């Protein structure tokens, strides 16, 4: 272990990629997961792009640099957590390693993360890119949910370190509810919710557009995003909240000032109901999506009820939040309250149905919030990759050359974690 350079931890999400070195508490770089490529190479499919290899190949930008580059086409290689364009992903990784981390990939072990329900073929592609293109000495592909559970140990609410729990991972593009038992994901019970950070931004944008005319149209999305991040919170009761704003507006209504990108003049808007209506779509999805009407508390309940009966109580007791979209104030408290109501109603009903003969033991419902929530997956990865055992469970270059990319289909669960 001594004298070894720290491992690199890279967590690629739909909206943002978090990267840094193991042992740190937060990622060194957080950047949009996008890549800007030359217009000419945009035309046609991947096969055609391969034909045009050459100088054009080196002409691309990633992250924040890629966002406003007019002659270039901005592409997002990851959709709903899963990599869709491997060519672009390889180029993205190239800049991450050499330009941002400034690392020599031959000298560092790598920990990459994968979303739930990622296919074994995708793991093989990842292994090929890392071992063939970058020649890394070792690679471990960790499941995001397990890392989020490990990160939750920093919370005061956690008494014992356990790898059994329900992870609610809500990022920019997708929200997953993932039950984990003893470090293994119960794949058949995972549910995904088609509401995440981006949907809240769009919904806030819609609300602002109806009411505030002063926002320049081309900036309405970034204004909505800023309003969401700065002012939004989750309220315990919608009707009471509306009354609060109606009776004492000056106390609750906030002001947001932005600068018009074209005229460079300031514009000011009032932010009222949007503050609590944005995140409310987690609990009333029908506000924003007429096709999906199940509140997040019911989804979590359904996921746990689908799991084997002997792990249900521990799953209710350890509900862990992870990802930027769970950062709204009081999100955890509201979720815990709604879920507790659902669970208590079920227990009461079973007692009534038995004619009072059965007295079910109350179920402890606990939603864990902690200050590492936003980068929980990355932080969990950083914790694990700084343990000596990490180097024993990594797949090495030697294994890869002997057996091939299929070695990365399975990544062992750490014993050291719990």
UniProtKB/Swiss-Prot annotation:
CDD domains: ASKHA_NBD_Arp3-like. The keyword Nucleus applies. One of its GO terms (molecular function) is ATP binding. It is found in: Cytoplasm, Cytoskeleton; Cell projection; Nucleus. The keyword Nucleus applies. Its main location: cytoplasm. Transmembrane segments: none annotated. Coiled coil: none annotated. One of its GO terms (biological process) is positive regulation of transcription by RNA polymerase II. InterPro entries: Actin, Actin/actin-like_CS, ATPase_NBD. Keywords: Actin-binding, ATP-binding, Cell projection, Cytoplasm, Cytoskeleton, Nucleotide-binding, Nucleus. GO terms for cellular component: Arp2/3 protein complex; cell projection; cytoplasm; nucleus; site of double-strand break. It comes from the Eukaryota. PANTHER family: ACTIN. Belongs to the actin family. ARP3 subfamily. Component of the Arp2/3 complex composed of actr2/arp2, actr3/arp3, arpc1b, arpc2, arpc3, arpc4 and arpc5. ATP-binding component of the Arp2/3 complex, a multiprotein complex that mediates actin polymerization upon stimulation by nucleation-promoting factor (NPF). The Arp2/3 complex mediates the formation of branched actin networks in the cytoplasm, providing the force for cell motility. Seems to contact the pointed end of the daughter actin filament. In addition to its role in the cytoplasmic cytoskeleton, the Arp2/3 complex also promotes actin polymerization in the nucleus, thereby regulating gene transcription and repair of damaged DNA. This is Actin-related protein 3. It comes from Takifugu rubripes.
């Amino acid at each position: 272990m001594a004298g070894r350079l720290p491992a690199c931890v890279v967590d690629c999400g739909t909206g943002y990629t978090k990267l840094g070195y193991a042992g740190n508490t937060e990622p060194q770089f957080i950047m949009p997961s996008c890549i800007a490529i030359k217009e000419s190479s945009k035309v046609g499919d991947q096969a055609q792009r391969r034909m045009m290899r050459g100088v054009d190949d080196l002409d691309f930008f990633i992250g924040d640099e890629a966002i406003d580059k007019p002659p270039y086409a901005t592409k997002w290689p990851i959709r709903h957590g899963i990599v869709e364009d491997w060519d672009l992903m390889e180029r993205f990784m190239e800049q991450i390693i050499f330009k941002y981390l400034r690392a020599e990939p031959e000298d560092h072990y790598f920990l990459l993360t994968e979303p739930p329900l990622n296919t074994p073929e995708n793991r093989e592609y990842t292994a090929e890119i890392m071992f063939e293109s970058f020649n890394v000495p070792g690679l471990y592909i960790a499941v995001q949910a397990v890392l989020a559970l490990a990160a939750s140990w920093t919370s005061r609410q956690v008494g014992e370190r356990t790898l059994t729990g329900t992870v609610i991972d809500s990022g920019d593009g997708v929200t997953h509810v993932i039950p984990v038992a003893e470090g293994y994901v119960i794949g058949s019970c995972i549910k995904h919710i088609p509401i995440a950070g981006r949907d809240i931004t769009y919904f806030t944008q819609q609300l602002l557009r109806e009411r505030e005319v002063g926002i320049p149209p081309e900036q309405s999305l970034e204004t909505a995003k800023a309003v969401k991040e700065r002012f939004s919170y989750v309220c315990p009761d919608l009707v009471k909240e509306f009354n609060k704003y109606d009776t004492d507006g000056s106390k609750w209504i906030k002001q947001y000032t932005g600068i018009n990108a074209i005229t460079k003049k300031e514009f000011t808007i009032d932010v009222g109901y949007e503050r609590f209506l944005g995140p409310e779509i987690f609990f009333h999805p029908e506000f924003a999506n007429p096709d999906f009407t199940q509140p997040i508390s019911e989804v979590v309940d359904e996921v746990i009820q689908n799991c084997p009966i002997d792990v249900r109580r521990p799953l209710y007791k350890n509900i862990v939040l992870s990802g930027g979209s769970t950062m709204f104030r009081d999100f955890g408290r509201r979720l815990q309250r709604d879920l507790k109501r659902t669970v208590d109603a079920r227990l009461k009903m079973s007692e009534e149905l038995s004619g009072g003969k059965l007295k079910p033991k109350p179920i402890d419902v606990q939603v864990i919030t902690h200050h590492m929530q936003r980068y929980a997956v990355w932080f969990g990865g950083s914790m694990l990759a700084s343990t000596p055992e990490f180097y024993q469970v990594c797949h090495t270059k030697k294994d890869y050359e002997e057996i091939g990319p299929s070695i990365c289909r399975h990544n062992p669960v750490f014993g050291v974690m719990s």
